[in-house]
From Swiss-Prot:
Species: Vibrio cholerae serotype O1 (strain ATCC 39315 / El Tor Inaba N16961)
Ranges where the HTH LytTR-type domain occurs: 135-236
Name of the protein: Uncharacterized response regulatory protein VC_0693
Keyword Kinase: no
Keywords: DNA-binding, Phosphoprotein, Transcription, Transcription regulation, Two-component regulatory system
Length: 237
């Protein structure tokens, strides 16, 4: 049996799909989410085999959410929507399948069988996903979309992944690995990514370490492993 997460801003649509999947006897719904941010968090927490995802949702669309998933660990994604004009883009972005609302039981059964066959293969090849020009973050009971060009750096700690601009700090459900692959942020430390355009100066420290100072005055550590590469990116050879 496969595990599934349902992401749709319409509760009735989620409940109806959950009933259909339960009737199939092959899919266990382990969670539901009403928006993309909540959905991304539950994908990381629950690690479902498949996500049934609506496309048109507030703030962040289903297609945008797909581009935020780590291609090495992402579940299969089945879009469930009332609009057929997104089908081509969905498949170009590596969606597993595309179902139209109201969901036809026979069509859903075919999708479930394909999912079961795919799961048996256990062949999840890396996929190329679109780059991100903004980072979805949460804070103070709101969703914040931070443009990449405003981000100075991002780092991980016990609380999760934090994104720092000149004026504010916010928390993101995206991993540093995804941010490194999907944005212009570059690795400078095992726990830090930095926007090269935000660097004002680099202080060389002892033992081959360094510290970057951003235009806003924030300090960002640089490990020996990444110092040489960073200097080359900035034109120092």
């Amino acid at each position: 049996m496969l595990s599934a997460l349902l992401i749709d801003d319409e509760r009735f649509a989620r409940e109806e799909l959950a009933e259909l999947l339960a009737e199939s006897g092959q899919i266990e719904v382990i969670g539901q989410a009403s928006n993309a941010i909540e959905g991304l968090k539950k994908i990381n927490q629950l690690k479902p085999d498949v996500v049934f995802l609506d496309i048109q949702m507030p703030q962040i669309s289903g297609i945008e959410l797909l581009s935020m998933l780590d291609p090495e660990t992402m579940p299969e994604v089945v879009f469930v929507t009332a609009y057929d004009q997104y089908a081509l883009q969905a498949f170009e972005d590596n969606a597993f399948d595309y179902l139209l609302k109201p969901v036809d039981t026979e069509r859903l059964a075919k999708t479930v069988q394909r999912l079961l066959r795919q799961h048996k293969k256990s062949d999840y090849s890396p996929l190329t996903q679109p780059s991100l020009d903004q980072i979805p973050c949460t804070g103070l009971n709101r969703i914040v979309l931070l443009p990449i060009n405003e981000v100075e750096f991002a780092y991980s700690d016990i609380s999760g992944v934090n994104v720092q601009t000149a004026q504010q700090k916010a928390t993101s459900q995206l991993t540093l690995k995804v941010l490194e692959e999907k944005t212009a942020l570059v690795r400078c430390h095992r726990q830090y990514l930095v926007n090269l355009k935000a660097i004002r100066e680099i202080k060389l420290l002892e033992n081959g370490l360094a510290e970057m100072i951003t235009h806003a005055g924030h300090k960002v550590p640089v490990s020996r492993r990444y110092l040489k590469e960073l200097k080359e990116m900035l034109g120092f050879y």
